[in-house]
Amino acid sequence: MIYAVIDTNVIVSALITKSPNSPVLQVIQRIFLGRVCTLVNDEILAEYKEILTRPKFGLEKETIDTVISELQNHSLNVDAPPSGVVLPDPKDVVFYNVVLTKRDDGAYLVTGNIKHFPACRFVVTPREFLDIVDAPQRTMFVNDFSR
């Protein structure tokens, strides 16, 4: 299973995009198909709800409720201790703390705002994340070890 913390900007972009081929929409589709387990906590879920209900996005309550419910159905709730990291946007710290907590499980942080986080291999754009999720699985054979 691939674990990922999904930044709010990815969810908003997926819901307002007009392109069915948009990487942000495809990330959400992979989650809803059960190919990705999202990592959340109460603070992240509260931010999702607060941001998605902003009038400027024009999202219907039913759509918001459905998306939040589906995300929760494909999520693992993570209790993340403070890491002490300081980020340009203090509201991003919770996302970073959650991904750090699950790094031993190979978790990723998927964001449209790469520059808001420390440069590291596990902070990725939606396009990069799709490349990871959709990478073909390699089967190892005994001959692989014979060299």
Feature locations, PLM:
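Acidic, metal-coordinating catalytic cores used for nucleic-acid/nucleotide bond scission
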Residues: 85-91, 114-115
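PIN/NYN-family metal-dependent endoribonuclease catalytic core
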Residues: 5-6, 18, 23-53
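Acidic, metal-associated active-site segment
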Residues: 89-108
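Acidic, PIN/NYN-like endoribonuclease modules and their adjacent C-terminal/linker elements
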Residues: 104-108, 112-147
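A secondary-structure boundary/capping signal
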Residues: 6-8, 40-41, 113, 125
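Acidic catalytic patch
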Residues: 42-45, 63-87
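Alpha-helix capping/helix-boundary segments
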Residues: 10-11, 44, 115-116
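Extreme N-terminal starter segment of soluble prokaryotic enzymes
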Residues: 1-3
